[in-house]
Amino acid sequence: MLDFLDYIQFAFSDASKWNRDNSYSQLTMTANALLDFSTPERLKVNLSSLSTPHFATTYTLGTVGLIDGSISYLFTTVPLRDTPSRGTLIPLRKLVPGYRQISAPSLPPGLPTVDGRDGDLAIGDTQGILKKKPTLLHATLHLPPPTTLTGLFLRRLSPTTQLSLAFCSSRASTPKSAPQAALVTQILHDTGKYSSEFLFSTDNALFGFKGLWNFGPDPRKQNQQGDPARESCRPLLSLLSAGAEAYYSPVSSVVGLSTGLRFTTLPAATESPHFTFPYTLTLTLTPLTGSMSTTYSLLASPNVSFSSRFGFNVYSWESEMVAGCELWRRSSNNRLHDDKSQRDSPLFAVDDLTWARRKMGLPDTAPSRNRECDDLPPPRRDNYHHQRSPHASDSVIKVRVDQSWNIRALWEGRVKELLVSAGVALGPTPRSSLSYASSSAAGGVGAAGGLSSYGWKSVGVSVLYSS
């Protein structure tokens, strides 16, 4: 589950119309959400509040074995009046990353097209927001000693450019040593057709570059209204993206290079039934280390997702195989309330899961209508969950397992006014030399030689209360 201030930061990106999906850093975001989720390892309590549309706070306390905490503050120049902040109103799918259905590339708001027309400025007061250059400030103080201070500064420099400054400063371990500090500067550029990112870190003077290119029509070359070419245009059914990243540090002589491909279906772009469920394929290569990784993620139904990953190293011949799934659940009362909310919602007429209901044999209740080609991008899938009933999803169960039988299970849901995460990790654990000698003397050495046993790795619960 996302931290409350991370949720607010994503709301800031949505309010300022910044596309977080069009980035090489997000190439494998769906597989990472389904396979690389973390489970709580102890008891953790979070108290959060969006006290004003511009200011949010979070207080965190962790216990069991080690007592620590943090104090976080966030300020934004963009008013987040439409962002739900109470635990009973926040859509759970906004807090729990899962299968993310990205939309087709679109023109950033305020960016003129090739023919000189302005981009999409008809959504809310986007034009006024961009003129004020949206800014976000975020700072977190981690306690107890050694005290660590982290911060983030975001500023929208133009409709296509965003500046990010992140820093981390830790108190010196000894009075005579200097405190450790690092600053990471990022400049992100997004035109819809492609995106680029320039990075510099004061830690070892690291320079980096990331780029992503989307194959297909260029949203900057949209035809004018009334153009006959618009009559024959068809919405995109899939999207192929290619990207790469490179790093270099002249201080430590570190060089990094990777490249990747992503192919994903775009079911939200059309109402015609598909011959397959939404899926996402990725391929990433790291030539210097000889690593290759492929992922396949599938949205089997509106509430069930599956994902798998296979990694291989051509130098060491080591391999990795991971599989995972997630299941969303709703109580009967909330399901009835949500169905009524969908019928009353204008979004019900453009439901992007109609084709999935047909494939599963469910009644197709969404009225059909002809979608005309226009300059607006297809509606984003996560916007449906924002405008639907706040109780559209009461809980979610995530499970992942790898080839070594390391298993992680996570339950996240709503309990009264609290948002709760409970998880457990199981897997092989190394035995101590004393216990191994005892089991060997007793003739209890297992098939694996007694070098490891299978058991609990961690159990934890995290509780979030927000207002």
UniProtKB/Swiss-Prot annotation:
GO cellular component terms, semicolon-separated: ERMES complex; SAM complex
Major subcellular site: mitochondrion
Location(s), subcellular: Mitochondrion outer membrane
Gene Ontology BP term (one): mitochondrial outer membrane translocase complex assembly
The entry's keywords: Membrane, Mitochondrion, Mitochondrion outer membrane, Transmembrane, Transmembrane beta strand
Transmembrane spans: none
Function according to Swiss-Prot or TrEMBL: Component of the ERMES/MDM complex, which serves as a molecular tether to connect the endoplasmic reticulum and mitochondria. Components of this complex are involved in the control of mitochondrial shape and protein biogenesis and may function in phospholipid exchange. MDM10 is involved in the late assembly steps of the general translocase of the mitochondrial outer membrane (TOM complex). Functions in the TOM40-specific route of the assembly of outer membrane beta-barrel proteins, including the association of TOM40 with the receptor TOM22 and small TOM proteins.
Family: Belongs to the MDM10 family.
Assembly notes: Component of the ER-mitochondria encounter structure (ERMES) or MDM complex, composed of MMM1, MDM10, MDM12 and MDM34. Associates with the mitochondrial outer membrane sorting assembly machinery SAM(core) complex.
Designated name of the protein: Mitochondrial distribution and morphology protein 10
